[in-house]
From Swiss-Prot:
EC assignment: 5.4.99.9
Organism: Mycoplasma genitalium (strain ATCC 33530 / DSM 19775 / NCTC 10195 / G37) (Mycoplasmoides genitalium)
Cellular component annotations (GO), alphabetically ordered: cytosol
NCBIfam families for this protein: UDP-GALP_mutase
Family designation: Belongs to the UDP-galactopyranose/dTDP-fucopyranose mutase family.
Cofactor(s) essential for the protein: FAD
Job description of the protein: Involved in the conversion of UDP-GalP into UDP-GalF through a 2-keto intermediate.
Gene3D superfamilies hit by this protein: NAD(P)-binding Rossmann-like Domain (3.40.50.720)
InterPro entries tied to this protein: FAD/NAD-bd_sf, UDP-GALP_mutase, UDP-GalPyranose_mutase_C
Protein name: UDP-galactopyranose mutase
Catalytic activity: UDP-alpha-D-galactose = UDP-alpha-D-galactofuranose
GO molecular function, one term: UDP-galactopyranose mutase activity
Pfam families: GLF (PF03275), NAD_binding_8 (PF13450)
Binding site residues for FAD: S31, E50, K51, N58, H77, I78, R379, I386, D387, M388, D389, K390, A391
Length: 404
């Protein structure tokens, strides 16, 4: 069911009365929306300003006008969490479908392999040697042990080394180098180790999740429910210079603002890139419609060995909507270096957390901390990759801080 947005959409910044709200939130992504919901429920008047023409940030989804299929404009978002506080918060807004994530691999040998790599994948890949290796794992490790690639490399067993060489050469290294645009040795180890090798017959992509899936009505409709409070006003299509840092003060719409400001945008941009630009990876999407019920075996298929594309995503398999329709929508993702003026790569998706960038970010963080009414929240403002459940939890904590 669609929810009507019961918030005021200002036509221009001149309509905004700086005295008409208690707290300003810059950014209508998941972090800002969750925060606004909690604050409004505590009788705070909240103004959200957003430069895009829609709410939801990168979680935004919409219905394709030609096929009537729901898709994610900025790539797939699968919700998962093991945090009860987050579960309690989303319960009135998210009714999750029963989707459990699994990622297919498209490799040269055309084997039906998936991630995470588990015993079933080892059998398919290595045959008799695979059965020997699984026996070795069962004798020497506890069932359901999750091994990182680095841990697999250290196992003194020739078949384990054979598996390691296959994974490093065909999966982890080519995918990561393409994704991050860096030599493999320079890529953050935490990034490489996000997907483990699971010592069990079956495995889950999100093994710690208590709940996982996608909202049955879509993320956008779920966010509209969160914003359905008369104390929340939203302004879309904003100029991105409404909030300005000048002379160690913040100005909103050319007026000095001393009320709390929660900023969810690029932290380096807020401070006019005074220390330099933080680096991000971006994505370019190629969208295709197919006149068939199903395009690929798995909802998400990683392509480590393809020249430029990292993965393809078939959205009807994620949303569980339109399975009967003889059409489907698939996106193909190509990563590149973020640059604001690049027509393909002008959206900052993934912070490149290395020594250089993290040192630069700390300078901006220190500068921001001197502004007593400024609060940084979300992926761009805190320069870190944040899963949706963590974004929600951080917004809950920020609300508690602002209300205390």
């Amino acid at each position: 069911m669609n929810v009507i947005l019961s918030v005021m959409l200002f036509s221009s910044p001149s309509c905004v009365n700086i005295n008409s709200f208690d707290i300003l939130i810059v950014g209508a992504g998941i972090s800002g929306i969750v925060l606004a919901n909690i604050l409004a429920n505590h009788n705070k008047r909240v103004l959200i300003v957003e430069k895009r023409d829609h709410i939801g940030g990168n979680c935004y989804d919409k219905v394709d006008s030609k096929t009537q299929l729901l898709f994610h404009q900025y790539g797939p978002h699968i919700f998962h969490t093991n945090n009860q506080t987050v579960i309690n918060f989303i319960s009135p807004f998210f009714e999750l479908n029963n989707y459990h994530h699994r990622v297919g691999l498209k490799l040269k040998n055309n084997l039906d392999l998936t991630l995470p790599f588990d015993f079933q994948q080892i059998y398919k890949l290595m045959g008799k040697d695979g059965r020997k290796l699984v026996s070795f794992f069962k004798e020497n490790f506890s069932l359901n042990t999750h091994l990182s690639l680095a841990e697999l490399q250290l196992i003194d067993n020739p078949l384990a080394q054979k598996l390691y060489q296959f994974l490093i050469s065909n999966v982890y290294k080519p995918y990561s180098v393409k994704m991050w645009g860096l030599p493999f040795a320079m890529i953050n180890e935490n990034v490489i180790n996000r997907v483990k090798i699971v010592l069990s017959e079956q495995s889950s992509y999100f093994p710690d999740a208590i709940i996982q899936g996608l909202p049955k009505s879509g993320y956008t409709n779920s966010f509209l429910k969160m914003l359905a409070n008369p104390l929340i006003d939203v302004q879309l299509n904003c100029k991105d210079n409404l909030l300005v840092y000048q002379d160690e003060k913040l100005f909103f719409n050319n007026n000095l603002i001393e009320k709390p400001v929660v900023y969810c945008g690029l932290i380096d941009k807020l401070f006019n890139f005074c220390f330099g630009h933080l680096q991000y990876r971006s994505l370019a999407f190629s969208w295709k419609r197919f006149n068939q019920k199903k395009y690929q075996t798995y909802p998400v298929v990683n392509m480590p060995l393809a020249k430029s594309i990292t993965r393809s995503v078939e959205y009807k398999q994620l949303t569980n909507q339109g399975s009967f329709k003889p059409q489907t929508i698939v996106s193909f993702e190509t990563p590149g270096s973020y640059a604001i003026n690049d027509p393909r790569f002008n959206e900052p998706y993934y912070p490149i957390n290395n020594t250089l960038n993290d040192t630069l970010f700390k300078k901006y963080w220190k500068k921001a901390s001197k502004l007593k009414n400024l609060h940084l929240l979300g992926r761009l403002a805190t320069y870190q990759y944040i899963d949706m459940d963590k974004a929600i939890l951080l917004s809950i904590k920020k609300a508690q801080q602002l209300l205390s």
